[in-house]
Swiss-Prot record:
NCBIfam families: PRK00668.1. Pfam families: NDK (PF00334). Its main location: plastid. This is Nucleoside diphosphate kinase 2, chloroplastic. InterPro entries: NDK-like_dom, NDK-like_dom_sf, Nucleoside_diP_kinase, Nucleoside_diP_kinase_AS. It comes from the Eukaryota. It is found in: Plastid, Chloroplast. GO terms for cellular component: chloroplast. Its EC number is 2.7.4.6. The gene is NDPK2. It catalyses: a 2'-deoxyribonucleoside 5'-diphosphate + ATP = a 2'-deoxyribonucleoside 5'-triphosphate + ADP; a ribonucleoside 5'-diphosphate + ATP = a ribonucleoside 5'-triphosphate + ADP. It comes from Nicotiana tabacum. GO terms for molecular function: ATP binding; metal ion binding; nucleoside diphosphate kinase activity.
Amino acid sequence: MGCLSVVGASPCVSSSALSSPTSRLSCAPSCKLILNPIKKNHHLAAFQPAVHLFASNQSRSHASKRNHTTRIFLPHLVASMEEVEETYIMIKPDGVQRGLVGEIISRFEKKGFKLTGLKLFHCPKELAEEHYKDLQSKPFFPKLIDYITSGPVVCMAWEGVGVVASARKLIGATNPLNAEPGTIRGDLAVQTGRNVVHGSDSPDNGKREIALWFGEGELCSWTPVQEPWLIE
């Protein structure tokens, strides 16, 4: 008999069932049959007991904390942030022609890095090919060499704590359209083939490129007066 309906875990008895003694008697056994499965599977209810909700939230919170704390920094970046490094920065021909030299230099100065080498230089083809030798197999290599040798470049050597990784962040992504606002490429460039500036991608390459672009006597070792306010 249709004397009982269930909403959630609570039985609802119709008014017609209450008015009939016979209905009430025949309904009792079916109540046990319907209620027992709900009681057994109470964890399927829409509203779980608070204790279970809090327990699951706490476990998720602890798990997220564990995941967060183990992925803050990459090991090689942590190490580089504690060491004084050298990096090679080059303002490419488009940056020179557009009058961006002062703007780009000021960004590194304001960051607190030390300029140890600076010159305006017309790059010969052989030097450009040596500098970009890792890209020789790329189809755009000839065009890249023509671009770098098309006009004067500004060669710079910079020194500072974690300067390689930090300079890469200041410069921004290779494709200026993907570079963050506030970065040099994000603010001053629009195309990969005219992305204004080059920066070393590792401490080892920083040393190699400085040695490649600067000759003996072209680097200056000095101590800025503000250095105690920049480095502990």
